[in-house]
Regions:
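Conserved SAM/SAH-binding beta-strand->alpha-helix loop
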Residues: 41
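Glycine-rich SAM-binding Motif I of class I
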Residues: 19-23
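A short glycine-rich, Lys/Arg-flanked "PGG" loop and its adjoining helix->strand segment in the class I
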Residues: 88-100
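Conserved SAM-binding loop
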Residues: 48-49
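Conserved class I S-adenosyl-L-methionine
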Residues: 7-17
Length: 146
């Protein structure tokens, strides 16, 4: 597993979509943990709110507005399909919001985002073949400022 699940984790999910990963995160979280789910689509945000979990706050805005400090940040955002400036703004926001021992978990279907990730993070990756199509899971931690 890419993440340890101690009691009071502060978690963010970027691009929560229709809640497939969100439900799995909520199932793993302790009663004292919190989840901020970022979803830019108000239609999808409504579906997330329907999960009705008091530990979760749905934020209907772009992931570039991530702020505060998190222990774990999950992202399924298709980084390469985003405009360069937005991609950089999101990665900068993640870097700034990640606690000193925090973990950023990025799901991607290509390895072409590695140069972007490397500017901000030290990472290791794992191929998930059960996923269709197969995906890369990047487990990233902060390194010195870019």
């Amino acid at each position: 597993t890419s993440v340890e699940w101690p009691e009071k984790l502060r978690i963010a999910e970027l691009g929560a979509g229709d809640g497939v990963l969100t439900r799995q995160i909520l199932a793993q979280m302790s009663p004292d943990a919190t989840l901020d789910a970022f979803e830019i689509s108000s239609t999808l945000a409504d579906k997330l709110n329907a999960l009705d979990d008091p530990r979760m706050t749905v934020r209907t805005c772009s992931a570039e507005y991530l702020s505060g400090e998190y222990d774990v940040i999950f992202s399924g955002l298709p980084l390469l399909s985003l405009p360069t400036e937005l991609r950089e703004a999101i990665l900068r926001a993640v870097y700034n919001a990640l606690g000193p021992s925090g973990v950023f978990v990025q799901f991607q279907y290509t390895s072409l985002t590695q140069p972007d990730l490397s500017r901000y993070f030290t990472w290791e990756r794992q191929r998930v073949l059960k996923n269709v199509p197969p995906a890369w899971v990047y487990r990233c931690t902060r390194h010195y400022a870019p």
